[in-house]
């Protein structure tokens, strides 16, 4: 383990303070990650995706693929974006979330997130470069890394950094990269993210089960019921009188 990289670069005091974060804080961070994934899947255009990730200005890609929690060696990349058209490019994205609305660079948590996030991105890129099937005669794919700090509630970008990678190309084909990422991403998580969520408009209206309209009777006022009761008594006295034309 390189003592100058990742959490190893923190002092003993800062490292102990970072590891002492309450479980509720860590759980909130995990939930924010899942919301980031769902948000990315809901975006329909590259402009929307680039805005959410605060990517630098560049070409407008017309087709791209998303992969989540991809196991790359001993690291897990939060998200890998593979842009396909007009030319292939790979973005490795690491999310770090905060409860505050500012990414205070002096806080122990921010320093730890920055150090660990940068190490994660570099390790993921190195693993991809050595593990993807090489293609002879191919110029390879350009690879970039993005460390994105988000607010846990609003998912607003607080800060974004683009760590420098040792090599900026992956010596492989687009097909080879997509196949590997499909196998290495968390399939159960992806299935859960892809599952359609019921909406208020999608619910079927409740069907009221009750008597048919022909079976409904109107409420009769008390005075009218009294009058009808008297009429019924008179009819009882007339039992035995057969009306002409009546059939049994």
UniProtKB/Swiss-Prot annotation:
Keywords associated with the record: Host cytoplasm, Host Golgi apparatus, Host nucleus, Late protein, Virion
Biased composition (Low complexity): 218-227
Membrane-crossing segments per the record: none
UniProt induction comment: Expressed late in the infection cycle.
Localisation per UniProt entry: Virion; Host cytoplasm; Host nucleus, Host nucleolus; Host Golgi apparatus
One Pfam family named in its UniProt record: Herpes_UL24
InterPro entries assigned: Herpes_UL24 (IPR002580)
Region (Disordered): 194-248
Any one cellular-component term (Gene Ontology): host cell nucleolus
Chief subcellular location: virion
Record function comment: May participate in nuclear egress of viral particles. Plays a role in the dispersal of several host nucleolar proteins including NCL/nucleolin and NPM1. Since deletion of host NCL/nucleolin negatively impact on nuclear egress, UL24 supposedly acts on this process through its effect on host nucleoli.
Family, similarity comment: Belongs to the herpesviridae UL24 family.
Protein known as: Protein UL24 homolog
Organism: Epstein-Barr virus (strain B95-8)
